[in-house]
Amino acid sequence: MDRDSYHHYFYDYDGGEDFYRSTTPSEDIWKKFELVPPPWDLGPAAGNPALSFGLLEPWPVGCAGDETESQDYWKAWDANYASLIRRDCMWSGFSTQEPLERAVSDLLAVGAPSGYSPKEFATPDYTPELEAGNLAPIFPCLLGEPKIQACSRSESPSDSEGEEIDVTVKKRQSLSTRKPVIIAVRADLLDPRMNLFHISIHQQQHNYAAPFPPESCFQEGAPKRMPPKEALEREAPGGKDDKEDEEIVSLPPVESEAAQSCQPKPIHYDTENWTKKKYHSYLERKRRNDQRSRFLALRDEVPALASCSRVSKVMILVKATEYLHELAEAEERMATEKRQLECQRRQLQKRIEYLSSY
């Protein structure tokens, strides 16, 4: 038990090292997964670690009534089988790189269908209860509290669903930088070599699953052609032969002439603006001329300004307003006089009628 608690299982063991943060894989990366030889001799019972520890103790039947005896019994089973589980999970994995890469490539090449369900990959004839290495259906209480915590996305080695294949991808960095992807794959337990193992894939190149950034989108249309001067300036320091320089000098004018003949000349912004300004100036002059002619006509209607040749617009408006008030008063006075004359006319008609009756 003490040996299992303090014995390290990998070469170059470093407690403070976090190999998930590594972004530069090397040829010796799989040496991290080269396991130290097991502390016991690998004999006929090496494939099944349960046989090397002897027969399993029978399930307790008469301990349901006494809680203290049950707790002591569970502690004894915990001390016995925790070591067995750790040995089974740590010493029965891959020890070389080629079988691991072959298994992963086969698994990823086959791929899961769209309607993937983990139960489709389970073997119907296989009974986990009969396997000595799978203790989940026999000891659910012991395996419910794992001793060693795995990473947040990977499953614990003592998971009860051993016959299922689960692939989990973990992304630790942003899309713009290189990031390792941790994949946990669980294979069939019927094969003694296929057990839970962890691999770390470092993405060195472009992540093809990531969306394209906006600046990398392809622009529609043909690219703009370089002017002849810029083309000559860029090609001159290249150190090419004289013949190539002559070809470069002669080609751009032909392309420019073809482009000018095919494409119509666009209207320049200055010409457009000048046309708009010219039309606006014409309308403004017309408005001012109409206004001036109207003011001159109004000045001629006002008797006080008829003899004045140069009068401001404000003076014309003031005198015209006063003249309108005078005309309104004269009209009212004339209307009153008209009513008086109408009244006198009626009185005279009545008098004529009275005198004609005699």
UniProtKB/Swiss-Prot annotation:
UniProt biased composition (Basic and acidic residues): 227-242
From the Swiss-Prot or TrEMBL record, state where the protein is found: Nucleus
Key words of the record: DNA-binding, Nucleus
Q: In which tissues is it expressed?
A: Detected in adult testis.
The main location class comes to nucleus
Q: What's a single GO CC term here?
A: nucleus
bHLH domain: from which residue to which, for each copy? Answer: 274-326
PROSITE patterns named among the record's database cross-references:
BHLH (PS50888)
- What does the record give under GO molecular function? DNA-binding transcription factor activity; DNA-binding transcription factor activity, RNA polymerase II-specific; protein dimerization activity; RNA polymerase II cis-regulatory region sequence-specific DNA binding
| SUPFAM superfamilies recorded | HLH, helix-loop-helix DNA-binding domain (SSF47459)
User: One Pfam family this chain carries?
Assistant: HLH
Q: Which cysteines are joined by disulfide bonds?
A: none
Q: Where is this region: Disordered?
A: 150-171, 219-245
Signal peptide residues on this chain, from the entry's feature table = none
Task: Write out the GO biological process terms.
Answer: regulation of transcription by RNA polymerase II
Q: Which PANTHER family match?
A: MYC PROTO-ONCOGENE (PTHR45851)
Assembly and partners?
A: Efficient DNA binding requires dimerization with another bHLH protein. Binds DNA as a heterodimer with MAX.
Protein name in UniProt:
Putative myc-like protein MYCLP1
Source species of the chain: Homo sapiens
